[in-house]
Design a protein with these regions (language model features):
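Alpha-helical interaction scaffolds
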Residues: 1-158
Length: 158
């Protein structure tokens, strides 16, 4: 579509630049506290995961530059390292881990070609995978195992 209709390029560029907000806007609400908000959060999480996968697939098709995906992944990783040190953020950290899993495992074939940035991303995944439950206020077994899954996926490709 973008090759056929020039106006689509501008629309796409605006959309991908505004996506950074949704990829970094993680919130959590307990279903016991506010079930409607909990349901909205679930929809927002699904949208975020879908967008992450969509942009990763666009990178694979060479429509989105890999630098943009690197930036998105690194931003989420940086936020994750901040959130694990905060109290009562384990659900948010779990969701960040899920997004990272989707983007990294689906884009690894291109992502690992930039050895310097890939090394940084991989090192952060390794660091989380080696953490112990409760070593940080908001680290959960789910997050630790999700990062182990990322490493396992990468190892299987080599």
């Amino acid at each position: 579509l973008m090759e056929r209709y020039d106006f689509m390029i501008e629309i796409f560029n605006k959309k991908i630049n505004s996506t950074e907000y949704i990829l970094n806007d993680f919130i959590y609400c307990s279903p016991d506290k506010d079930y409607d908000q909990f349901c909205k959060n679930n929809k927002s999480n699904e949208k975020r995961r879908s967008l992450g996968l969509f942009y990763t697939n666009l990178m694979l098709e060479k429509i989105v530059d890999s630098d943009k995906i690197f930036e998105m992944i690194q931003d989420v990783q940086k936020d994750l390292f901040i959130k694990i040190k905060q109290d009562d953020s384990s659900n948010i950290v779990d969701e960040m881990s899920e997004l990272l899993y989707i983007m990294i495992t689906n884009g690894v074939s291109i992502l690992k070609t930039n050895k310097i940035i890939w090394s940084d991303i991989n090192e952060r995944v390794l660091t989380i995978s080696k953490m112990k439950h409760k070593s940080e206020p908001s680290i959960s077994n789910k997050t630790i195992f999700k990062h182990m899954d990322i490493l396992l996926f990468i190892d299987k490709l080599q």
